[in-house]
Amino acid sequence: MNKTLVAFASKQEFNTLFPQISAVVAASTPVSVGALYDVTVCGVGVLDFSVNLASQLSKHRYERVIMLGICGAYEGRDIQVGEVVRVDTEVVGDMGVQNAEGHFIPWGELIGEPVIYKGDSPRLLPLRLASVRSVVGVTVNTCTGTRYLSLRRSGMFNADVETMEGAACFAVCKKFGASVFQFRAVSNIATDRDTSAWKIPEALAALKSEVLDNL
């Protein structure tokens, strides 16, 4: 067993980057990739990801967890499709209440203090990874599908990208005392939903060359 665990949410993303390893096997127990790191698949969304990552960390001792995946970038944040970013801070973007006028109020606003989840200092990373662009992420259960929601979420949280597991990964790793980092490759702009414009294979190729090959 290695000291670093590389965690994926999606079996499809994992299969693209590690075609030689069964995603089904990696979802049940971490698989070693030589002497470099172990890999695992924890499931899409905060619930599956947090439960499965917690299960793995309760059985195996890792000093460091690196989460890899794709993400959407919000409009107007000067982030390009295919760009690799390091998500250092996350908030949960759709946890809160709706008031009588139909307006969404974030949970942090309700309790009077922001609820922020953070990764560890990039100074703990190899120089190549420490120099990757740092961004703020929003973890959601329902992905943005309109330009209106994209601008609203990015403005409300001053956020750059949208994920479905980032906050969960940070929270679980902190609980288990493992240092944690999250890298994402932008596959699309989170705006009016148009899957024909998505560049998932290209984003995953960038993730491999810029992150995996530099671990």
PLM regions: where:
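N-terminal short beta-loop-beta anion/metal-coordinating cradle
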Residues: 1-55, 59-60
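Conserved acidic residues
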Residues: 63-65, 160-161
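Glycine-rich phosphate-binding loop signature in dinucleotide/nucleotide-binding domains
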Residues: 58-63, 176-178
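Regulatory input/activation interfaces that engage signals or partners
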Residues: 180, 185-215
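Conserved beta-strand elements of the Class I
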Residues: 3-7, 66, 85
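Mid-sequence, gly/pro-rich, charge-dense loop/helix-turn segments that line enzyme active sites
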Residues: 75-157
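A C-terminal functional module that forms or caps the active site or interfaces directly
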Residues: 140-191
